[in-house]
Each structure stands twice: as structure tokens, then as C-alpha cells.
Curated annotation (Swiss-Prot):
HAMAP family: REV_HIV1. Residues 38-49 have a biased composition (Basic residues). The keyword Lipid biosynthesis does not apply. It is found in: Host nucleus, Host nucleolus; Host cytoplasm. Belongs to the HIV-1 REV protein family. This is Protein Rev. The gene is rev. Its main location: host cell. Residues 23-52, 92-118 are annotated as: Disordered. A motif (Nuclear localization signal and RNA-binding (RRE)) lies at residues 36-52. Pfam families: REV (PF00424). Escorts unspliced or incompletely spliced viral pre-mRNAs (late transcripts) out of the nucleus of infected cells. These pre-mRNAs carry a recognition sequence called Rev responsive element (RRE) located in the env gene, that is not present in fully spliced viral mRNAs (early transcripts). This function is essential since most viral proteins are translated from unspliced or partially spliced pre-mRNAs which cannot exit the nucleus by the pathway used by fully processed cellular mRNAs. Rev itself is translated from a fully spliced mRNA that readily exits the nucleus. GO terms for cellular component: host cell cytoplasm; host cell nucleolus.
Length: 118
């Protein structure tokens, strides 16, 4: 499903169903605008805290069922000085210059593999 390798579709669907149920079972609409300023502030604060709890539980469900974090792994990119554009094939006259798919050459492909799962 969606190009995920190694993850079972059933696990993904189960996680999505659980998270959907979690959000639907929270009969907690946004707070009403009535009342004093302090009362409104307290209602908003409590509502935001409940929403944060639901979000953190959803992240834990994802990490449990899919075996990975819900947050993306930071990608280590090489310095800009080491990147070059190879335009040997597609550079033509001024009318077609820049058309095509330039290749980006990187010295060490192992830099991009540092975020893989162990």
C-alpha cells in the first residue's frame, strides 16, 4: 500500500482504523466562545492538552503497528560544494537549454543510507 516495503497492508489498515476510532470516540468539540476570558482560556488549554494526548497516542499506535516512528528520519545531505549538475546530453541551443532531466552527482551514496532501519 502506497509503496511501503516491509510493512503489511493489514497492519497499516489496523493502525489507521484504531487512530480513526480514537479521534471519533473523543466527543470533545472545540470549546465554546462564551464566558469570561479566564474561563475561555482554561477551556482552550484543557482542549489543546486533550488533543495533544490523542496525537501522542496516535504516534504510539503507528510506531507499535508499523515498527517505526511517525516522525521522518532526518536526512543527511552532502555539502552544496560537492553537488554538480551533469548536462552533457540535454544541453542544446538557447531554445532548449535547461529542458530535460539534469542528473545530480554525489560523491558518496552511503551518506543517504544513514537513515535506514537497522
Amino acid at each position: 500500500m502506497a509503496g511501503r516495503s516491509g510493512d503489511s497492508d493489514e497492519d497499516l489498515l489496523k493502525a489507521v482504523r484504531l487512530i480513526k476510532f480514537l479521534y471519533q470516540s473523543s466527543s470533545d468539540p472545540p470549546p465554546n466562545p462564551g464566558g469570561t476570558r479566564q474561563a475561555r482560556r482554561n477551556r482552550r488549554r484543557r482542549w489543546r492538552e486533550r488533543q495533544r494526548q490523542i496525537h501522542s497516542i496516535s504516534e504510539r499506535i503507528l510506531s507499535t503497528y508499523l515498527g517505526r516512528s511517525a516522525k521522518p528520519v532526518p536526512l543527511q545531505l552532502p555539502p552544496l560544494e560537492r553537488l554538480t549538475l551533469d548536462c552533457n546530453e540535454d544541453c542544446g541551443t538557447s531554445g532548449t537549454q535547461g529542458v530535460g532531466s539534469p542528473q545530480i552527482l554525489v560523491e558518496s551514496p552511503t551518506v543517504l543510507e544513514s537513515g535506514t532501519k537497522e
